[in-house]
Amino acid sequence: MLMVISPAKSLDFTAPDQVLPLTTPELKPQIAELAKVTRKLTAADLRRLMHISEKLAALNHERFQHFDPQVEEGLQAVIAFNGDVYAGLNARELDRPALEWAQDHLRILSGLYGVLRPFDALQAYRLEMGARLKTKRGANLYDFWGETIAKTLNAAGKDHADPTLVNLASQEYFGAVDAKALKLPVVTCHFKEEKGNTLRVLGFFAKKARGRMARFAIDNRIDKAEGLKGFNLDGYEYRADLSTPADWVFARLQP
């Protein structure tokens, strides 16, 4: 079983309390190609591209000027990302054996890096997958990555006892996984809140629940997707009546 999650816009480069290995991102040629493109962008370009403030545009312009794909330094990706998904995952509290298990069973999708393993060295950046960044390969990052992300996931999951790819990513990021090139069976998890007679997905809760699901799998060393149906953290439970073989629904009473 292989899980995929989205990255986060916010980052925390505070060093973890424990010494952890640092691995090299797998898609260095593509990362270098994108780095050349982003280095040429002005702060104003970045502001328009990602609809961000002048302050954030200036920060990320500076980041891209100093970004060097050939330098193997940074912080472990699963530690550095700091959004809602990662609040649910809380990787800083995982011990090394748990993180080593995650290195084999968890992948982070990224606009700049394509696919990251938990220990992969991350340098500070912001480049959303939905950004319409023009490259020699096309009009946006979906064109740029093409089949690459899917093929990388195929290689990561093919030798697992259960090759199922568990989608815990957003539509923006999972959209970069070419469905025709992907050879792994896919299960997408949906997290819904019940209020009155209505079930709905609420962004903040859903993001945190995706991280909690990944943490549940890591803590319990779940290597077959079927085991995820036992997820019961924060009041969620699997709803067979709302699920299909490819889409699993977990619901709870809205807090």
Curated annotation (Swiss-Prot):
InterPro entries in alphabetical order: YaaA
Coiled-coil stretches noted in the UniProt entry, renumbered to this chain: none
Signal peptide: none
GO biological processes: response to hydroperoxide
Stated family: Belongs to the UPF0246 family.
NCBIfam families: PRK02101.1-3 (NF002542)
Protein name: UPF0246 protein Caul_4480
